[in-house]
Amino acid sequence: MTGAHFKYDESRDTLYITFVPGKKATGIALNDQLLLRVDKATRQAVGITIFDYSYLAQPTAIGVRSLPLTGLTELSTELHELALEILQKPPVNAILLLSAYSPSVTETIPITLLQTEMLVTA
């Protein structure tokens, strides 16, 4: 992935991904492990912080690990829509694949999975 800067802090098991170095950003907690950093004025991703990275990057016995985006429910409508917009376009969608879990016909929960193959080649 061109243009992205990766920094792994082994002692904290945290991966920092920066798309626009030095740019001030608003942090949006997608859940306890994922922090999306955005420029609200330009509606662009500035970076992603992935906590517990080594755990999240490991597949389970039945496949890749999906994470509910529980933090979206706590956002204002404006930030919720901005986060979903940014998650669905480059460069973020090359790292986090957005999907939906539907436990019933009336409920949809946004989830994501970490596309580790993109990080290995970066």
List where the protein language model places each region.
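Intrinsically disordered terminal and processing segments
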Residues: M1-Q33, Y55-I62, S66-A122
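Active-site and channel-lining beta-strand-loop segments
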Residues: Y8, D32-Y53
